[in-house]
A protein has these predicted regions:
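Oxyanion-binding and handling regions
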Residues: 28-145
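DPxDG-like acidic metal-binding loop motif
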Residues: 1-2, 6-27
Length: 145
């Protein structure tokens, strides 16, 4: 459900909602960053990130020990320096960048299902984390008036 590119997040969310609605089945809204962490087998503190724009990243930190994954931070967007500082504060030992895979997404969805946190298609919402370019430009115009 994101974060990621606006178009990719919209297409992915629409596809999941469509399949869920058509089959009248619950679905799992999975963070791209959590899916990345679930796709890794490394133990320690994981810093998972995706390129957002030049000099910025979407990122989150997770702790994995003995197969258990614990989220340390929520999904964020910020300057690469902010991500690096957060990784250092949490003692990150594993850095995963732009390495999503279907197995990680499936494992994250399976974890949601096992914990009873599936949702219906109307509850799933995209996670953009930042304004679109059109929204940013509109906001700038409104502030100038």
């Amino acid at each position: 459900m994101g974060p990621g590119s606006f178009t990719g997040v919209r297409i992915g969310t629409a596809a999941v909602k469509g399949f869920s609605w058509a089959q009248d089945k619950p679905c799992a809204g999975v963070s791209s960053l959590q899916a990345m962490a679930c796709g890794s087998t490394e133990n320690g503190v994981l810093c998972c990130s995706l390129k957002a724009r030049p000099g910025e990243s979407f990122y989150a930190l997770f702790q994995r020990e003995d197969g258990f994954l614990i989220r340390l931070t929520k999904d964020k967007v910020g300057k690469d320096e902010e991500m690096e500082a957060a990784a250092e504060r949490h003692g990150a030992t594993v850095f995963l960048r732009d390495c999503q895979n279907a197995a990680g997404a499936a494992k994250a969805a399976w974890m949601q299902a096992r914990s009873g946190k599936l949702q219906n298609c109307h509850e799933i919402l995209p996670a953009y984390l930042r304004l679109s370019q059109a929204e940013r430009l509109r906001k700038e115009r409104m502030e100038q008036q």
